A protein has these predicted regions:
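Signature of Gram-negative chaperone-usher
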Residues: 4-7, 21-223
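Bacterial N-terminal signal peptides
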Residues: 10-17
Length: 223
């Protein structure tokens, strides 16, 4: 089983054994040998894990509702964004009133249970120098085909009730922003790890999964 080490580049020697040899009626002789170990930053990609029960030994396969060929692979390097959910707000009737729509839960291949939508970060640099994660909505929602009202003016995505989770032991958790209201073109802070914190793999998820009866504009009920 492959083990991944989190640590700064380190070359260290230490005594591992004291060898003794003694003949009858003679003084014992000693010879000391040493051990050598080296740790380097882990640059292997980190697969997504269940945000509610993160275990790197049990990776998951999330589904991207916006891309049948997705999801996109995680970023490269020892400090990486491993995964971020795409949001699916379903089909909704046009209304002239303000409406609130909730994103569907994160789904997975192989019939795994649904989870809240989440983003996953891994810090395998070994420096414990901290990090910050921001999100930017590139532009306002708009139709795939040009129409008179092709842009959803005034719509806003909100992320609330975050939970930061990891299987890392004896490590201080990063801090997540309690509520985020996205503004197109503007970066919003999602989570940050101060100096000396944030090492390992961390999932930040929002809210909890609720089972509801959902009716879209085609009158199809989803449970």
């Amino acid at each position: 089983m492959k083990k991944q080490f989190t640590g700064i580049v380190l070359c260290s020697t230490f005594a591992v054994a004291g060898w003794s040899l003694q003949a009858k009626a003679e003084e014992p002789k000693e010879y000391r040998s040493n051990g050598l170990v080296e740790f380097i930053p882990n640059v292997d990609p980190t697969e997504p894990v269940d945000p509610e029960n993160p275990d790197p030994e049990k990776p998951v396969k999330p589904i991207d509702p916006t891309d049948p060929e997705g999801p996109n692979p995680g970023t490269q390097g020892p400090l990486s964004i491993d995964y971020a959910s795409s949001f699916d707000f379903g089909k909704n009737r046009i209304s002239n009133k303000d409406q609130v729509y909730f994103a569907r839960a994160q789904q997975y291949q192989e019939n795994q249970k649904e989870t809240p939508n989440f983003v996953q970060i891994s810090d395998n640099r070994g420096t414990n120098s901290g990090w910050s994660l921001t999100v930017t909505q590139k532009e306002q929602f708009k139709a795939t085909k040009a129409t008179l009202n092709s842009q959803l003016t005034g719509a806003q995505i909100s992320l609330a009730n975050p939970t930061v989770n990891s299987n890392a032991q004896n490590v201080v958790k990063p801090e997540a922003t309690n509520k985020i209201a996205l503004v197109p073109g503007t970066a919003s802070l999602v989570a940050a790890a101060k100096q000396g914190t944030g090492a390992g793999t961390w999932a930040t998820y929002w809210g909890k999964v609720e089972v509801v009866a959902e009716r879209d504009e085609t009158n199809t009920v989803h449970n």
